[in-house]
């Protein structure tokens, strides 16, 4: 039987996301989530059989949209360099709800919760193969160093695509050196670092 279309499920997801951020998944009660959502525990169980399923729904509600954008950004018809720029630009424009879900995922990883394994499985069937395919195309085309293990390339990309943007946004103007790029400008700088490193470029002798 199809469930009726109402705004209850989105309200539950929003309330759960905020509660999970505040108290963690294990520290949040369905009673508190129901109260925040203006509904009953029974309605939560109607849509989400367990608290863990509610957590995964909170993640998936945001992740599926990000995944679609990543898939579009990394379209194999595009040159690898352009794909990387588009990927980094997408992470430069993360919305608040997307950052909140990233925080939830990070919390689960730090706590080494059983839920994290399911998240890893989801990501291994989601954005990770899309990014890895782009990097392998880059080694084939000579854009990236094919002598390096593909997972090294993947980890380097992961380290540059998201964390610097989050740190830059959190620190704001409190950086010790003025004029630091942000947003898309920072994204392009980070792609350049990924492709060329931070050592000074050598000018060929004439």
How does the language model describe each region?
Residues 1-7, 11-14, 18, 170, ...:
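N-terminal intrinsically disordered/low-complexity leader segments
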Residues 10, 58-86, 116, 131:
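Amphipathic alpha-helical linker/stalk segments
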Residues 11, 19-53, 57:
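Helix-turn-helix
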Residues 12-20, 91, 194:
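Short hydrophobic clusters on alpha-helical segments that form packing/core surfaces
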Residues 51, 58, 62, 66, ...:
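Hydrophobic/aromatic residues within well-ordered alpha-helical segments
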Residues 82-85, 118-123, 140-156, 184, ...:
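All-alpha amphipathic helical-bundle segments outside canonical DNA-binding/catalytic cores
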Residues 90-93, 97, 125-141, 156-206:
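C-terminal peripheral helix-coil segments that are non-catalytic and often amphipathic
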Residues 96-118, 167-173:
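Amphipathic alpha-helical segments used for helix-helix packing
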């Amino acid at each position: 039987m199809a469930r009726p279309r109402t705004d209850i499920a989105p309200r539950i997801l929003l309330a759960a996301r905020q509660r999970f951020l505040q108290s963690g998944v294990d520290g949040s009660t369905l009673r508190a989530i129901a109260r925040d959502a203006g509904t009953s525990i029974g309605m939560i169980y109607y849509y989400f059989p367990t608290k863990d399923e509610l957590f995964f729904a909170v993640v998936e509600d945001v992740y599926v949209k990000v995944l679609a954008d990543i898939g579009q950004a990394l379209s194999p018809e595009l040159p690898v360099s352009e794909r990387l720029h588009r990927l980094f630009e997408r992470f430069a424009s993360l919305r608040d709800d997307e950052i909140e879900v990233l925080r939830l995922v990070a919390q689960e990883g730090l706590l080494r919760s059983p839920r994290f394994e399911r998240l890893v499985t989801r990501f291994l069937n989601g954005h990770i193969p899309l990014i890895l395919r782009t990097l392998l195309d880059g080694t084939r085309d000579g854009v990236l160093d094919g002598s390096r293990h593909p997972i090294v390339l993947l980890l380097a990309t992961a380290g540059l695509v998201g964390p610097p943007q989050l740190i830059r946004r959190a620190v704001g103007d409190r950086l010790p050196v003025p004029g630091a790029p942000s947003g898309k400008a920072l994204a392009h700088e980070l792609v350049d670092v990924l492709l060329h490193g931070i050592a000074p470029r050598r000018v060929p002798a004439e």
